[in-house]
Design a protein with these regions (language model features):
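Transmembrane signal-anchor hairpin modules in multi-pass inner-membrane enzymes, especially those
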Residues: 1-104, 118, 124, 128-141, ...
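Alpha-helical transmembrane segments of multi-pass inner-membrane proteins
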Residues: 3, 23, 61-63, 89-97, ...
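Loop-to-helix entry and N-terminal half of a specific, functionally important transmembrane alpha helix
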Residues: 29-40, 144, 356-393
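Juxtamembrane membrane-water interface segments that cap and precede transmembrane helices
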Residues: 40-46, 154-164, 284, 322-333
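Membrane-interface helix caps and helix-loop-helix hairpins in membrane proteins
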Residues: 47-49, 98-107, 156-164, 209-210, ...
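Membrane-interface micro-motifs in multi-pass membrane enzymes
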Residues: 49-57, 108-111, 163-176, 215, ...
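A membrane-periplasm/extracellular boundary helix in multi-pass inner-membrane enzymes
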Residues: 153, 206-210, 231-277, 281, ...
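Long extracytoplasmic/lumenal interhelical loops at the membrane interface
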Residues: 273-291, 295-338, 359-368, 372
Length: 449
């Protein structure tokens, strides 16, 4: 009897020591990668162009990844998502000579697109535990906070800008994609990080208002609806409170001019504060360019017009006269620039991300130890739905958020499949496409991919 009473605190102490040891042993590459996520998604280099922060942080992360890893690169390259990402990158390279402006395509691929490929590969290669994924989420939340605070302090005018490369629609897009991850962390996560996530998510809703982005509002409403519908019976009250809080923020801070502009989502017209462009409604403003995009894709179905040159191809399609427009649709953007093969690969990545999240949530029902992976996967899935809705009205085919979400889904699926292969009553078998790539994670456990 005495032995049993003394064994309890010993076991508790052992678990605590293991938990603290896991936190202390977080690989430096994960921290460096979180900083890289912050730099890339937060567009920090725009504020310090002479420092080349993206190159510096990428270099540090790459060196740490190569020095601290014992993984088989060959197996990494056989993952379906990796193959699709590299195939898209390969298409962007081989189509450069056939681009309507080869020099611009070369610049885009070597200066912009390659950073997204690196972001995806290094996340899949280095993130080996649920804790590592959470650390990367800190990088995302920090990027969101930077954009939120910058917009609130320095954003001026009807369509505020706070970076050289993000317009108001882009900022709203980042908020919508990041909001579900922060909300799920607050609802189902533990520790002080959930309160940081809650603050960031609340500010994200306010930021969507400040951007006056119609696509941002529609995407946010869809995400809120999914958040409420997908909540379990235990979480429904808490989720309803979160959704209600978001609605109250929209109602409290949305001005009359804001709602007049939002009314043009469904109908043309609007009040006196609505510009002539907005008064045509979303359909009236977007349909001409969408129709032109479809024709461009049909004219260049195999190799496209070249990566990063949609607006140039669109301008040349009507002789250079008038306005040269962006796609305002990620699916048409990738289809025009990289042809139908690029569009197919793009849709495949979206499909695989949703599938990975479903794998994690299904296995989590069998293994309670996967509770953290489960809410992370749920957040990633909701974020992807926000991306898809926003992608129908924004040119976000080469978004860092997309490659971040796809990579995180791959990491979570490998962690869940590794848990499923452990000996036990329900540990046999694994989801297809995830076996055969193992390494020691940040928590000291083996994680297979």
């Amino acid at each position: 009897m005495t032995f049993k009473m003394e064994s309890v605190p010993i076991q508790i102490g052992t678990r605590r020591r293991r938990r603290f040891a896991a936190r202390a042993s977080t690989p430096p590459v994960v921290v460096a990668l979180a900083v890289y996520v912050f730099v890339v998604i937060g567009r920090v280099p725009d504020a310090f162009p002479s420092v080349h922060l993206a190159i510096v942080t990428a270099g540090i992360t790459g060196v740490l990844a190569l020095l601290g890893s014992n993984r088989d690169l060959g197996r990494l390259l056989r993952i379906p998502e990796t193959l699709a990402v590299l195939a898209l990158f390969g298409l962007s390279i081989v189509t450069i000579p056939f681009s309507v402006w080869p020099g611009q395509s070369l610049t885009f691929v070597t200066r912009s697109y390659i950073t997204l490929i690196f972001l995806f590969l290094v996340i899949v290669y280095c993130a080996r535990s649920a804790r590592a994924v959470q650390i990367l989420l800190y990088g995302l939340l920090a990027a969101m906070l930077l954009l939120e605070i910058s917009l609130m302090l320095w954003g001026k005018g009807d369509r505020p800008l706070v970076t050289n490369t993000y317009d108001s629609n882009d900022i709203a897009f980042i908020m919508v994609c990041g909001f579900p991850l922060g909300a799920m962390w607050f609802l189902r996560g533990r520790g002080p990080g959930r309160y940081i996530a809650a603050l960031t998510s609340a500010l994200a809703v306010t930021t969507v208002l400040l951007t006056r982005s119609r696509g941002g509002l529609v995407s946010l409403c869809v995400v809120l609806a999914f958040l409420l519908v997908r909540a379990s019976s235990r979480e429904r009250i808490g989720t309803a409170v979160v959704v209600l809080a978001c609605v109250l923020i929209l109602g409290a801070f949305g001005s009359k001019e804001y709602w007049e502009r939002m009314a043009t989502i469904w109908d043309s017209g609007g009040g006196p504060a609505v510009s002539a462009y907005d008064a045509t409604g979303v359909w009236g403003a977007r349909w001409p360019i969408w129709r032109a995009s479809l024709w461009l894709m049909l004219e260049h179905p195999v190799i496209g017009v070249g990566a990063g040159v949609f607006d140039i191809a669109e301008g040349l399609s009507h002789g250079g006269a008038g306005k040269w427009s962006t796609a305002h649709n990620a699916f048409l953007q990738i289809g025009v620039e990289l042809g139908i093969p690029g569009l197919v690969l793009f849709i495949f990545l979206l499909y695989r991300t949703v599938k990975n999240c479903h794998i994690v949530m299904r296995l989590a029902r069998q293994h309670p130890q996967l509770s953290v992976e489960a809410w992370l996967a749920s957040g990633v899935e909701l974020s992807l739905y926000g991306f898809i809705v926003a992608a129908f009205s924004l040119s976000q085919a080469y978004s860092s958020m997309l490659y971040f979400l796809v990579a995180i889904s791959v990491v979570l699926a490998r962690l869940a499949s590794q848990r499923n292969r452990l000996p036990g009553p329900r540990g046999a078998g694994s989801p297809g496409g995830m076996a055969g790539f193992s390494g020691r994670g940040a928590d000291g456990a083996e994680h297979a991919l």
